[in-house]
């Protein structure tokens, strides 16, 4: 497991295609994905993208975006874009990647890690619960400012 680089962006887009095919709110758009991935990779204050490689092939990824919580008065992480290719699931790769991401966040002074999953993705809910996450009472709301 290591940090993604700019040269990984095409393969990261392929992983995001897999993820977005499962998520109701998102559709793949490589131009926008490349822009966002580049911004994260190029600025460690924004976040980090962690990847799992098999030889030169990316088989999993997760990103951690950093912000400050006024409730905690400290840095926190938002875990996003967590995906492992289907043919590599159920063999511990996701668990290792998540554990690595949590440790990375802790070492980078994150006092809390938050993530979102689709409401009906029970497999993901069980996975995160097995790994120490719990359902928050907070409910996300979105406003797409380009649509207003």
Locate each region found by the language model:
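Conserved beta-strand in the GNAT
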Residues: 51, 57-66, 83
């Amino acid at each position: 497991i290591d940090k993604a680089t700019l040269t990984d962006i095409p393969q990261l887009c392929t992983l995001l295609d897999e993820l977005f095919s499962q998520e109701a709110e998102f559709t793949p758009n490589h131009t926008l994905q490349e822009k966002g991935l580049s911004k994260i990779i190029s600025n460690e204050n924004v976040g980090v993208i962690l990847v799992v490689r098999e030889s030169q092939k990316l088989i999993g990824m997760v990103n951690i975006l950093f912000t400050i919580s006024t409730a905690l008065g400290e840095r926190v992480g938002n875990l996003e874009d967590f995906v492992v290719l289907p043919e590599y699931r159920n063999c511990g790769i996701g668990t290792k990647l998540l554990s690595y991401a949590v440790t990375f966040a802790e070492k980078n002074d994150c006092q809390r890690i938050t993530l979102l999953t689709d409401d009906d993705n029970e497999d993901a809910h069980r996975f995160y619960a097995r790994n120490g996450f719990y359902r928050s009472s907070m409910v996300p709301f979105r406003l797409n400012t380009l649509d207003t």
